[in-house]
């Protein structure tokens, strides 16, 4: 009985840790995707390229904070070149959010200490809205 326990308990513990890891990574993916969509949307409703970039970055950061996601490092990139398009032309703003999630506390052998999660989202800019 002791031998079975010596083999079974660590394997069961590793199984539980992998379930926790999978859940944590999936929740982080959803949070990063939501932040990317919010950043793209916030950027697309601004009137200037510089306002779009700053608004998109602020929206992504706020979204990650609101969802309680603790990123070791965060990178938000907003491509607002659509604001240079002439009126009447369809264009999109794209936001890319990258978050390194710390998973070292799970102490799973062979697992890196962080997982990098990246999401990209686009939102259309109103083709006939005045741009400055």
Regions found by a protein language model. Give the residues of each.
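Short, conserved structural patches
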Residues: 45, 49-132
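Alpha-helical assembly-interface signal, strongest on the long, hydrophobic N-terminal helix that forms
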Residues: 1-61
């Amino acid at each position: 009985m002791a031998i079975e326990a010596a083999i079974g308990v660590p394997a069961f513990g590793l199984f539980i840790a992998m379930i926790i890891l999978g859940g944590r990574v999936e929740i982080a993916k959803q949070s990063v995707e939501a932040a990317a969509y919010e950043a793209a949307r916030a950027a697309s409703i601004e009137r200037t390229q510089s306002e779009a970039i700053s608004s998109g970055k602020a929206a992504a950061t706020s979204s990650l904070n609101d969802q309680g996601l603790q990123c070791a490092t965060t990178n938000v990139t907003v491509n607002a070149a659509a604001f240079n398009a002439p009126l009447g032309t369809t264009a999109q703003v794209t936001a890319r959010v990258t978050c390194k999630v710390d998973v070292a506390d799970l102490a799973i052998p062979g697992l890196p200490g962080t997982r990098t999660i990246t999401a990209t989202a686009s939102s259309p800019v109103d083709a006939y809205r005045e741009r400055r």
